[in-house]
Amino acid sequence: MNIVILAAGTGKRMRSALPKVLHPLAGQPLLAHVIDTARTLKPTHLVVVVGHGAEAVRKAVAAPDVQFAVQEQQLGTGHAVQQALPLLDPSAPTLVLYGDVPLTRAGTLQALTERAGQGGYGVLTVTLADPSGYGRIVRDAQGKVARIVEQKDATPEQLEIAEINTGIIVAPTERLGRWLAALKNDNAQGEFYLTDAVEMAIEAGLEVVTTQPEDEWETLGVNSKQQLAELERIHQHNVADALLVAGVTLADPARLDVRGTLECGRDVSIDVNCVFEGRVTLADNVTIGPNCVIRDANIGAGTRVDAFTHIEGAEVGANAVLGPYARLRPGASLHDESHVGNFVEVKNAVLGRGSKANHLTYIGDSDIGARVNIGAGTITCNYDGANKFRTIIEDDVFVGSDTQLVAPVRVKRGATIAAGTTVWKDVEADALVLNDKTQTSKTGYVRPTKKKS
């Protein structure tokens, strides 16, 4: 099977320099959703027709299995499909999809292609309470499809029809090419309508078959920011509903955003206003507090993530405690039972089993062993303005508050670093290291006061 995705439109009502099909829904372009769905049908040829913003669209969705055809002038859907014909297998049917209709289920498309068969013409339709703006499905006395009439070309009687054309069709490719070549643009829009091929198929002796989706929202398109926002909420509702069915506890399903894939184990609990981006895995008994953002991360079983924690590109072991207000940046790896507390940032660093950094700390480019205590205000000084260096802290080290570790440096097993120490040389095992500082007290000191004006 061939699949053609039309993505050449200007999207004027979006009022944006970004091509319409590249506006994000759930964290990825509208067009990417359509391509992902198309791939599940395993097409032999997958062609995207580009036009407005062609280079940006190519760059955004380029892949080995995606070919591109160019519609230099936007002369209608029939003209757009014509541009893809040279890239298609003429002996296989062609399914036509739209880059701004992102929520159609693969099963809906599969049902349409199966109904049409190898040589039939199939149209995906839907019956709406308010069909305004859509092409109407006109049927004959026997209930068979006779033609599709666009809204601007419809008679008052035809405007009363509630069954509308979604634009998604499947047709035999070789014959479709001949029908498209015969299209005329003598209509209100002055365009070559793909829908006009229906009458040609009927004249050629084909019965045009139809199927309908399970839900109306599967065929909704995006022409404005309002519609984009509506589809975002529909999609997020569907994601939340699937998580609930799978046993995930959501404090409020309406206040969850999944912008990628979220895999959850048993007894996972997610509080309000959390955002998950990229690929995120939450193992059994993970608890996510409110207002967290987690991107491309794996969280181990029993771990608790408290409020306002941001995690990106990190691996977290089992029974860890994060936050509130913690930040894990790419390359952070926290082993089992580790703690990263409020206003602690970890980047490209390993925190060993049972190690804790509970307050006001930066750990970057570091390897920290097991059972290490990192005191409040500790900083790993890893950057000299040009190069990054690593700090190595072995097992059972105690790092006092307000310590600066100037990398490259190693603190060996069991060492103790006194509060307020700057460490720029390696520390031996079980040693105490401190900077000698003299404390001076002056009795009877009078604090300066501001002069009164």
Swiss-Prot record:
Specify which residues bind Mg(2+) according to the UniProt entry for this protein: D100, N223
Output the Gene3D superfamilies linked to this UniProt entry. Answer: Hexapeptide repeat proteins, Spore Coat Polysaccharide Biosynthesis Protein SpsA, Chain A
Localization per Swiss-Prot or TrEMBL: Cytoplasm
Main localization category:
cytoplasm
- Outline the segment boundaries, as ranges, of region: Linker: 226-246
Q: In which residues is UDP-N-acetyl-alpha-D-glucosamine bound?
A: 6-9, 20, 71, 76-77, 98-100, 135, 150, 165, 223, 329, 347, 362, 373
Q: Which Pfam families match?
A: Hexapep, Hexapep_2, NTP_transf_3
Cellular-component GO terms for this entry: cytoplasm; membrane
Which keywords annotate this record?
Acyltransferase, Cell shape, Cell wall biogenesis/degradation, Cytoplasm, Magnesium, Metal-binding, Multifunctional enzyme, Nucleotidyltransferase, Peptidoglycan synthesis, Repeat, Transferase
What cofactor(s) does the depicted protein rely on?
Mg(2+)
Q: Which GO terms describe its molecular function?
A: glucosamine-1-phosphate N-acetyltransferase activity; magnesium ion binding; UDP-N-acetylglucosamine diphosphorylase activity
| Residue span of region Pyrophosphorylase | 1-225
- What ranges does the record give for the region N-acetyltransferase, renumbered to this chain? 247-453
Q: Which example biological process does GO assign this protein? A: regulation of cell shape
EC number annotated for this UniProt entry: 2.7.7.23, 2.3.1.157
Keyword Cytoplasm in annotation: yes
Regarding protein family, the annotation reads:
In the N-terminal section; belongs to the N-acetylglucosamine-1-phosphate uridyltransferase family. In the C-terminal section; belongs to the transferase hexapeptide repeat family.
Quaternary assembly: Homotrimer.
NCBIfam families reported for this sequence: glmU (TIGR01173)
Could you tell me what this protein is called?
A: Bifunctional protein GlmU
Q: What is the lineage of its organism?
A: Bacteria, Pseudomonadati, Pseudomonadota, Betaproteobacteria, Burkholderiales
Q: Identify the coding gene.
A: glmU
